[in-house]
């Protein structure tokens, strides 16, 4: 490997790599998806150079693999991210990222009167893709919100 192509974030032997995360979103993903609730090593790259995005974030989690459902829930924040499963330093599987029909226990309802704020229930939103944007409907108060309203509410 030449000096020009040196990895900026160390490779992992086994685990998950979430790449092409928009810059400034990596920490939010770690928090919202509780990715730090592990004793495994996590490597984070922030504001790394990217041909596609200009700048990007990157998360590597050793000995941990995301389910397809978990990967899909990332699409709300990082629609063009890639989720790679690594074994023996090689990519063995790429999980597709598509917006799921439902997102549970990640987002917070922007409606301050929603029971999800006062009751011990997990948040749940139905996801509907429209021509202009993504609309989320809270399972409990049944109010609809544009994606950005919910994301900024976290």
From Swiss-Prot:
Entries under Pfam families matching the protein: PyrI, PyrI_C
Protein name: Aspartate carbamoyltransferase regulatory chain
Binding annotation for Zn(2+): 109, 114, 138, 141
InterPro entries the UniProt entry points to: Asp_carbamoyltransf_reg_N, Asp_carbamoylTrfase_reg, Asp_carbamoyltrfase_reg_C, Asp_carbatrfase_reg_C_sf, Asp_carbatrfase_reg_N_sf
Lineage, top ranks: Bacteria, Pseudomonadati, Pseudomonadota, Gammaproteobacteria, Enterobacterales
Protein species of origin: Photorhabdus laumondii subsp. laumondii (strain DSM 15139 / CIP 105565 / TT01) (Photorhabdus luminescens subsp. laumondii)
Family of the protein in this entry: Belongs to the PyrI family.
Cellular component terms per the entry's GO annotation: aspartate carbamoyltransferase complex
Keywords on record: Metal-binding, Pyrimidine biosynthesis, Zinc
Record HAMAP family: Asp_carb_tr_reg
GO molecular function, one term: metal ion binding
Cofactor: how and how many bound: Binds 1 zinc ion per subunit.
């Amino acid at each position: 490997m030449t000096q020009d192509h040196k990895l900026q974030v160390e490779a992992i032997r086994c685990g998950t790599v979430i790449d092409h995360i928009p810059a400034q979103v990596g920490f939010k993903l770690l928090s919202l998806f509780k990715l730090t609730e592990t004793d495994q090593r996590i490597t984070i790259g922030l504001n790394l150079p990217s041909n596609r995005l200009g700048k990007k974030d990157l998360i590597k989690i050793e000995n941990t693999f995301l389910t397809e459902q978990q990967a899909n829930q990332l699409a709300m924040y990082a629609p063009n991210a890639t989720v790679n499963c690594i074994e023996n330093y090689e990519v063995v599987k790429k999980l597709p990222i598509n917006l799921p029909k439902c997102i549970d226990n990640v987002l917070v309802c922007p409606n301050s009167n929603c029971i999800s704020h006062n009751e011990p229930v997990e948040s749940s939103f139905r996801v509907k893709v429209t021509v202009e944007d993504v609309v989320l409907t809270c399972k409990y108060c049944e109010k609809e919100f544009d994606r950005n309203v919910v994301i900024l509410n976290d």
